[in-house]
Every structure is written in structure tokens, then in C-alpha cells.
Amino acid sequence: MMTLTLAELAKITGGELHGDETVCVSRVAPMDKAGEGDVTFLSNPKYAVHLAECKATVVMLKAEQRKHCSGHVLVVDDPYVAFAKVAQALDTTPKPADGIAPSAVIASDAILGQNVSIGANAVIETGVTLGDNVVIGAGCFIGKNAAIGQNTKLWANVTIYHQVQIGADCLIQAGTVIGSDGFGYANDRGEWIKIPQLGSVRIGNRVEIGACTTIDRGALDDTIIEDNVVLDNQLQIAHNVHIGYGTVMPGGTVVAGSTTIGKYCAIGGASVINGHITIADGVNITGMGMVMRSIEEKGVYSSGIPLQTNKEWRKTAARVHRIEEMNKRLKAIEKIVEQKKED
């Protein structure tokens, strides 16, 4: 079990400790369930009333909340960020693989860095390069001439197609497919002719990709995911999409081909983004957004109808279907009013 002293917690978070720096903690826990040996945090002031009864060894909070807590306190600028840093330090998640399994199939010319781990039944094809400390989970497939940077981890059954380039310090969850063919077809009098997808996928450093996400290879140029991007589970990123630095996408979102998404964007879950458009830096799209045209200015954008009771929704839907009729009636009324003004 990993343990940290409160002095070490203060160093990790950059916080100011009020208490015994030699006391140890071994687990992060929610405030209502924390006990001896646990560290917890207060990020929402409305829960400050519970501090008096909190049994955690130490609480991370803002300076203005310190008066509510009589035990060990770590004063930090942002308790939620401090929680993330401490959770990383106390992380007990096992590695996807440890060492090279006897059943792994590794091409003789594959280049493996120092301390590489490859799980059972993984396949590493010819020309592959794996950097130092790369971890390949059980059942993964790494295609010809692909390259994976140092410290990157792939969980079980990830598929990396030929020539895909993945940077350093990335994390890819189970079942994700990177570099499969984009949806490219030409129509010849009703017959669909497949267009070979001759580009690849380039993924930057410190990128995280959730489970069962698909990122298609480019048709001619590459599909590009820049540094520090976070992609959730079950996303579809089509061919030649370019996602900018630090952008985040929750689950279920679909991005059609050749669309460029800027830096530091936040795309809400289950959104649909049209192809061949551009989204500016700093755009925030709320959940289930349907983006059909380019967005040229940063800001918050929404579409769709928020949840209503079924009765209210049916009335709203009926009114929407009558909008054209109502518009014609309104124009007719306006015309009559204008005529009366002239008279």
C-alpha cells in the first residue's frame, strides 16, 4: 500500500499545511466516507457544513473554509486540482502488462526501447518502434511501421493500424481502434467505389483516449490529434479531422471528415459535428450539440431541446411543425396592418 506524509502532500499540491507533517495517508475518499488514513477535499462551499463531522485524516480546502475544520488541513488554491494530483500520487491501478508475455508475437525487426512490457497474445508487426517504458496490453495489435512514444500505455485489445504515429505519455483504453479506413467512396451511377485511405493518424503527446473509440486514417493527408487532447469513450473521429491542443470531448460524439477543431475547445457529450467545417479556439458546445456550420468566435453554443415532460414536449413538437403555417399567417396579418396604416 502506498502512503504519503502530509508534508509530501503539501509538496505535491503546493498547499499550506496546518497540522502534523509526519502523519500519513494512503487513500483518497469522499468526505462523507473518509476515515483514518484518508485524504479528502472540499471543492463546493455548500458542503462546508459537513466539515465538522468529517473523519478524514486531512482535508484539502480553500483558505476561507479553514475555520470550519478543526483537524489537519491543507490549504490549496483549487481543491479539485489538488485532489487530482493526490489521486495520481496514490493511484493503485495495475499496469496493462508487466514484462513480455511468452505468447506475444513480435516481429524480429521491431525496435523495443528500455523496460517495454507486452501482454499475452499481443501482435507487434514488422517495422514497429516502441519507446522506453511503453506498455502494450493483452491482445493488442500494432501494425506495420507504427510508432509509439515513451511511457505510453495501451490497455487490452487496442488496435493500432499500419504507419500510425502516437506520441509520448499517452493513455489509450481498451478496445480503441486507431487508423482504420475512413469512410471514402465515389458513386459511379449507383455503384459505390471504395477510395483507398492513403494517409495515416498522428497523435501528439499526453493524449488520453477512452475505451472503444475509433479514429480513422486520412484519405490523403493524416488525421491529427494534437498534444494534451482528451477523448472519452465511444467517439467517432473521421478521416482528416484535426483536433487542436488541449481540446476535450466526452463520450458519444461524432466528428465528420475534414473538420478542424481549435485549441482548448470543450465538446459536450453525444454531439454531432458536420464535415469540412472549422471550429475556432475556445469554443464550448453543450451536450447533444448539432454543429452544421463553422463557428468563427469562441463562446458557449447550444442546440436541441432540454428535457420536458412528455406532455409538454408533444405540445412543443406540434408547435414546431406548425411554424411555417404560423409564419404565413403572421405575414398576412402584418400586410393587413400595413394596409390599414396607409389608409
UniProtKB/Swiss-Prot annotation:
Sequence similarity: Belongs to the transferase hexapeptide repeat family. LpxD subfamily.
Catalytic center residues: 239 (proton acceptor)
GO annotation, biological process: lipid A biosynthetic process
A Pfam family: LpxD
Keywords: Acyltransferase, Lipid A biosynthesis, Lipid biosynthesis, Lipid metabolism, Repeat, Transferase
Pathway(s): Bacterial outer membrane biogenesis; LPS lipid A biosynthesis
Lineage, broadest ranks: Bacteria, Pseudomonadati, Pseudomonadota, Gammaproteobacteria, Vibrionales
Subunit structure, as described in the record: Homotrimer.
Native species: Vibrio vulnificus (strain CMCP6)
InterPro entries listed in its UniProt record: Hexapep, Hexapep_transf_CS, LpxD, Trimer_LpxA-like_sf, UDP_GlcNAc_AcTrfase_non-rep
SUPFAM superfamilies: Trimeric LpxA-like enzymes
TM helices/strands, residue ranges: none
Catalytic activity line of the entry: a UDP-3-O-[(3R)-3-hydroxyacyl]-alpha-D-glucosamine + a (3R)-hydroxyacyl-[ACP] = a UDP-2-N,3-O-bis[(3R)-3-hydroxyacyl]-alpha-D-glucosamine + holo-[ACP] + H(+)
PANTHER family (alphabetical): UDP-3-O-ACYLGLUCOSAMINE N-ACYLTRANSFERASE, UDP-3-O-ACYLGLUCOSAMINE N-ACYLTRANSFERASE 1, MITOCHONDRIAL-RELATED
PROSITE patterns tied to this protein: HEXAPEP_TRANSFERASES
Functional description taken from the UniProt entry: Catalyzes the N-acylation of UDP-3-O-acylglucosamine using 3-hydroxyacyl-ACP as the acyl donor. Is involved in the biosynthesis of lipid A, a phosphorylated glycolipid that anchors the lipopolysaccharide to the outer membrane of the cell.
Protein name stated in the entry: UDP-3-O-acylglucosamine N-acyltransferase
GO molecular function, one term: N-acyltransferase activity
Class of the enzyme per the UniProt entry, highest EC level: transferase
EC number: 2.3.1.191
Gene Ontology CC annotations of this record: membrane
